[in-house]
Regions:
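An acidic/histidine-cluster motif and surrounding catalytic segment
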Residues: 1-138, 149-183
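Short active-site segment of divalent metal-dependent hydrolases/proteases
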Residues: 142, 146-147
Length: 183
């Protein structure tokens, strides 16, 4: 069996790229680091026979590509309104690739989908919640990856509990405190 590979592509909105603090913002989204997070998440899921995955969507020894797009509140709000009917800038949106298995089998890297992150909202939430920006970004990206893999906490309490359990375990492996515990 060949070693699975995880390719992460991070892009930034043109408006955000012109921000005075762009260099600091860009450092928050290192492709190699996020690829490691994906590898650790998939390793964890592989070892969890109880973890459910939407319609057997993912074979965890496959090589994957993950795209992240970091944007502004204006664009995040428009996307949230267009695709979810919610008129506010949200922290993260997940757009799964949902390729048919016969197509995915032909590709060297299976696209998981795209995570759209509004950095300003994430930064504001981290400050409000008394969390480090790095810890909050890590949590949200792990959360978004789970959505791309077919997990959905909006289906009910059992699904929410399962997602949170996985997030807490993977974040602990990454040295990040439980984001659901009040500080």
């Amino acid at each position: 069996m060949t070693q699975a590979a995880y390719d992460v592509i991070v892009s930034f909105s043109d408006t955000l790229a012109q921000h005075a603090d762009f260099a600091a913002i860009k450092c928050c989204y290192e492709e190699a680091k996020i690829g490691d997070w994906l590898a650790r998440l998939l390793t964890y899921l592989r070892a969890q026979p109880s973890a459910w995955v939407h319609d057997g969507l993912m074979v965890f020894d496959t090589s994957y590509e993950l795209s992240l797009y970091i944007t502004t509140p204006t664009e995040a709000r428009a996307l949230n309104l267009d695709y979810r009917g919610k008129d506010y800038a949200t922290n993260i949106l997940s757009y799964p690739a949902d390729l048919p298995a016969e197509v995915a089998d032909e590709l060297p890297l299976v696209p998981l989908g795209e995570l759209v992150i509004c950095h300003a909202v994430v930064d504001e939430q981290a400050a409000e919640q008394g969390k480090s920006l790095a810890a909050h970004i890590t949590h949200l990206i792990i959360h978004g990856m789970l959505h791309l893999l077919g997990f959905d906490h909006e289906l009910g309490q059992a699904e929410q509990d399962e997602m949170e359990r996985i997030e807490i375990a993977v974040l602990a492996d990454l040295g990040v405190a439980n984001p659901y515990e009040l500080s």
